[in-house]
Amino acid sequence: MAREHPHIVIAIDGPAASGKSSVARALGRKLRYVYVNTGAMYRAVAWLALEKGVPPLDAGRVQQLLHFTEFVCDVRAGESTILLDGIDPAPHLVSAGVNASVSAIASIPDVRRLLTKKQRAFAFDYDVVMEGRDIGSAVFPETPYKFYIDASAEVRARRRANQGLQDSIAARDTQDSTRRTSPLVIAEDAHVIDSSNLTIEGVVGEIFGRLKLKGLPLGEL
């Protein structure tokens, strides 16, 4: 696919608790690119559905709810932000209800189409580090800068527990990798990094080195 946008996109994908969010945020700061957390967008829709009493598995009602909601994506302090009818959902995005609902929300094709459009729009205005589960495979398949961050199931479960989250890593992996629309996959040309025994700085350093090898102009960084 030819690049339709004027800015650089670094795609970082991976399963839950692989460390991709922390890595993507740190890389964005190092490069002075905008950090975009696409998972937060799906979590925002899950929160909205729960707030309005709409079952996350009811695709038709979720789509209708989104149709009548002002969903605004913007950038503040170098990171993506979300407003739903003027309300910032950020404080609610890691609740137990949202954790239990987000995979169902992410499996709704019309939701993915809407959010993919919003995600691609960032690259018309900014150089971005964008993380999620289908950035390199579906949202920006044309970018040459693709990374897949993974870790062992044991390490990922421990990280979730340290975050105060008790949801099942195995169940979430199954949901994400078997959904019909944009499942979690490793993009064919992605560079895979196992973060199990690496610090955030170590993963960022490996990505940085790979970007240099790919010829990304990094200036004096």
Language-model features: locations:
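Extreme N-terminal, non-catalytic leader segments
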Residues: 1-9
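Hydrophobic anchor at the beta1->P-loop junction of P-loop NTPases
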Residues: 12
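Walker A (P-loop) phosphate-binding loop of P-loop NTPases
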Residues: 17
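Conserved lysine of the Walker
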Residues: 20
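Hydrophobic positions on the alpha1 helix immediately C-terminal to the Walker A/P-loop
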Residues: 23
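N-terminal phosphate/diphosphate-binding loop that engages ATP/GTP or pyrophosphate donors
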Residues: 29-95
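Small-molecule kinase domains that catalyze NTP-dependent phosphoryl transfer to phosphate-bearing small molecules
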Residues: 74, 119-126, 133-142, 162-208
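ATP-dependent NMP and nucleoside kinases share a basic, alpha-helical "lid"
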Residues: 90-162
